[in-house]
């Protein structure tokens, strides 16, 4: 079985392409990094990408925090993250929150527990991470939402844009199950809802 070094080497051409592409389109040579050589800049970006891959199996508390920036073109390769609150317009209106003990529910006000980090896992699939609690949003095979200190397959959610410009989040590991909040702000079981129901509609807010 190939080790981390083999996987890292296999990804190097893609990383080089992403770094050099902006200058290639202008027909010019890539400039050197302000604080060193171009090689040093490439190495820095490469190490950052590999570190995120290798740390995926560690508890999040052991992983370094990284600044989140707004998503744009090329985010899927470089792992660009978005800081958002996910607002569900049910009842009095609730933001999805991840509590320090790993419980997941809704809260009406903007709180530190409702600040989430959305990171692309692959095109159309994201992880949802509680910035304050340091837990990932995850969904079990029975549709129960829970906070996971590790990133696992149950932490992958397919981000679906709906006709009303809200998003639905379908568990990638358990298709047909969606993140949902009740009119009282409680987490609903993902296997008892559908994207046609308002309880599954979330609006990402800054």
Swiss-Prot record:
Its main location: secreted. GO terms for molecular function: fibroblast growth factor receptor binding; growth factor activity. Keywords: Developmental protein, Differentiation, Growth factor, Mitogen, Proto-oncogene, Secreted, Signal. It comes from the Eukaryota. It holds the Pfam family FGF. GO terms for biological process: fibroblast growth factor receptor signaling pathway; neurogenesis; positive regulation of cell division; positive regulation of cell population proliferation; positive regulation of MAPK cascade; regulation of cell migration. It is found in: Secreted. InterPro entries: Fibroblast_GF_fam, IL1/FGF. GO terms for cellular component: cytoplasm; extracellular space. SMART domains: FGF. Residues 1-29 form the signal peptide. Plays an important role in the regulation of embryonic development, cell proliferation, and cell differentiation. Required for normal limb and cardiac valve development during embryogenesis. May play a role in embryonic molar tooth bud development via inducing the expression of MSX1, MSX2 and MSX1-mediated expression of SDC1 in dental mesenchyme cells. PANTHER family: FIBROBLAST GROWTH FACTOR (PTHR11486). Interacts with FGFR1, FGFR2, FGFR3 and FGFR4. Affinity between fibroblast growth factors (FGFs) and their receptors is increased by heparan sulfate glycosaminoglycans that function as coreceptors. Belongs to the heparin-binding growth factors family. This is Fibroblast growth factor 4. It comes from Bos taurus. The lineage of its organism: Eukaryota, Metazoa, Chordata, Craniata, Vertebrata.
